[in-house]
């Protein structure tokens, strides 16, 4: 109520931490106040980055029924106790929710506005919820009708193309599907994401629904006729729920979901991987870094129909040999510097496996540590790496694979490649 109760400092998060929890216990006198208003103000110094997950406010008070339902906890208890709920009505029941999620009704007795409970089953820190059975509670609202569908009835399917719910990309996805049907003889199914959610995650958008859908097709297929390809025809967002300021203005129906590692709060140990959707054997999915996908997975990161059309146009041209050339036999491997050469070694391991798999492919290697680094007041740079990389990209390559640091805007700390460079490349 206008009085400062406490100042709490949240320490910085270390490299191996994901979050910090701050607790505070304060006593204050609210005598004479009909209502106590607790206000939380959060500020951070310039350059600091942090997001509050939740604030928990716990206090002791008399058990007086408020509104149509009221949740409270038992606190620490050594013995079985009875509790009295004042301002009660005869239609109130009390539910107990244990730590493991079990819900039971607590026996009680009503007498003249007081509800008394008697139960030896109430434990320390149980959550109790008093509910007026005859009260008017909000009712579920109809959001939309779900049309009849049956993805489980799909037969032999070589390729699945998933498209966003909005349907903006469906026409171009069908165009690409027709190309693969005619040119490659594949059985292709174009499926909207919301249809997958309806059958594999109870209508809730969930990236794992994509995997469950593919596993259904995988398990029911005859030997040798399992799905071979999954194409995610639509862009993704690191904020799947689009709750952050960066994504709040976007329409989630224009995007497909991403699978993110459990440790998604870490800038080092978190990652987005599409391979997850292809781990289809019964024993797979627990060790994501070692399990191997059972089909090829790709994504066309289109948001608008114009972007989708440009991508499909390029695939059609590629299929028709319009841009035939020796670049189709060229592989470009890129390896960042630092970190005890781990990025260069990773890139080289992949390069050697590619060379051993297909002798018709020529592997070009650009490893940062093989070039001279220039040190200036504005930072470190690799001018020769940048020059050779841009030349290789302009010439063309079947595959460009980079191992190292970067972001959505630049490649490596030395800013070897940026978005503007990619926009300047012209097909010839």
Ranges and model annotations:
Residues 1-428:
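Cysteine-dependent hydrolase recognition
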């Amino acid at each position: 109520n206008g009085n400062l109760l406490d100042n709490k400092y949240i320490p910085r998060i270390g490299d191996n931490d994901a979050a910090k929890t701050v607790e505070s216990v304060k006593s204050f006198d609210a005598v004479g106040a009909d209502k106590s208003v607790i206000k939380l103000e959060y500020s951070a110094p310039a350059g600091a980055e942090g997001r509050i997950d939740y604030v928990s406010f716990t206090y002791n008070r008399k058990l007086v029924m408020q509104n149509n339902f009221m949740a409270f906890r038992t606190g620490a208890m050594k013995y079985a106790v009875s509790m009295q709920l004042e301002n009660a009505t005869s239609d109130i029941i009390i539910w107990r929710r244990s730590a493991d999620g079990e819900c039971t009704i607590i026996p009680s007795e009503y007498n003249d506005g007081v509800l008394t409970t008697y139960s030896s089953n109430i434990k320390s820190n149980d959550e109790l919820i008093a509910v007026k059975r005859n009260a008017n509670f909000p009712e579920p609202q109809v959001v939309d009708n779900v049309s009849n569908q049956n993805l489980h009835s799909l037969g032999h399917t070589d390729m699945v193309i998933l498209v966003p719910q909005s349907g903006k990309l469906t026409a171009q996805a069908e165009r690409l599907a027709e190309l693969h049907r005619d040119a490659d003889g594949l059985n292709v199914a174009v499926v909207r994401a919301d249809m997958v959610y309806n059958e594999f995650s109870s209508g809730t958008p969930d990236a794992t629904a994509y995997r469950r859908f593919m596993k259904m097709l995988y398990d029911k297929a005859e030997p040798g006729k399992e799905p071979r390809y999954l194409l995610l025809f639509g862009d993704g967002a690191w904020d799947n729920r689009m709750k952050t300021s960066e994504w709040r203005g976007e329409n989630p129906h224009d995007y497909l979901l991403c699978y993110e590692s459990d440790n998604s709060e870490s800038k080092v140990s978190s990652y987005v991987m599409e391979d997850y959707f292809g781990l289809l054997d019964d024993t797979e999915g627990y060790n994501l870094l070692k399990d191997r996908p059972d089909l090829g997975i790709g994504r066309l990161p289109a948001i608008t129909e114009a972007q989708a059309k440009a991508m499909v146009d390029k695939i059609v041209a590629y299929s028709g040999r319009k841009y035939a050339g020796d670049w189709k036999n060229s592989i470009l491997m890129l390896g960042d510097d630092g970190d005890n050469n781990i990025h260069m070694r990773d890139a080289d391991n992949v390069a050697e496996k590619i060379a051993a798999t297909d002798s018709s492919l020529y592997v070009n290697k650009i490893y940062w540590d093989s070039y001279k680094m220039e040190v200036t007041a504005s930072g470190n740079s690799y001018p020769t790496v940048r020059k050779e990389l841009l030349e290789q990209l302009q010439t063309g390559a079947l595959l460009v694979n980079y191992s190292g640091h970067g972001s959505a805007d630049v490649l490596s700390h030395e800013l070897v490649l940026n978005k503007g460079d990619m926009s300047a490349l012209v097909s010839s």
